[in-house]
Amino acid sequence: MDLVVGRVVKAHGISGEVVVEIRTDDPEARFAPGAVLRGRPRSGAEREYTIESVRAHGGRLLVRLAGVADRNGADELRGTVFLVDTAELPAIDDPDEFYDHELEGMRVVTVDDAPVGKVAEVLHTAGGEILAVKADEGGREILVPFVGAIVTSVSRQNATIVIDPPEGLLDLA
């Protein structure tokens, strides 16, 4: 299974750098100079890219890739996602930490065992992580902050997330 670790947002400057939105908790290792990443463009075939240089830029990364020498080449990469195979990921020892792909697809229920839906996606925002839950009824999207005050437990074994939603949270959609 593939896991997205970054996405090209746009070109930066005229020398071929791209702005990359980080989707990994280990960008120093994933985007280190010399690292090779698989890239999947919005259209076209996957290919490998070698990182030549990287620097921080306002919560994102400015990345120079081998073979991308100008703005036109960088513009062609807009929307490209960088991928790793989940089998290559190190195991997580902390029972309270999760990879996004582990949470996606899990069943969400309230502390009273009332069904809410399934996690469709984990959103990474400036305010923290949010679970985008597709509701069982009507298929609407419910956004649940992934914080201890709301998410009371996560069971990998049962593929279930238990939430204690504040009043009105499940009505917002």
From Swiss-Prot:
GO terms for biological process: ribosomal small subunit biogenesis; rRNA processing. GO terms for molecular function: ribosome binding. Pfam families: PRC, RimM. One of its GO terms (cellular component) is ribosome. Residues 95-169 form the PRC barrel domain. Signal peptide: none annotated. Gene3D superfamilies: PRC-barrel domain, RimM. Binds ribosomal protein uS19. Belongs to the RimM family. The PRC barrel domain binds ribosomal protein uS19. HAMAP family: Ribosome_mat_RimM. An accessory protein needed during the final step in the assembly of 30S ribosomal subunit, possibly for assembly of the head region. Essential for efficient processing of 16S rRNA. May be needed both before and after RbfA during the maturation of 16S rRNA. It has affinity for free ribosomal 30S subunits but not for 70S ribosomes. This is Ribosome maturation factor RimM. The lineage of its organism: Bacteria, Bacillati, Actinomycetota, Actinomycetes, Mycobacteriales. The gene is rimM.
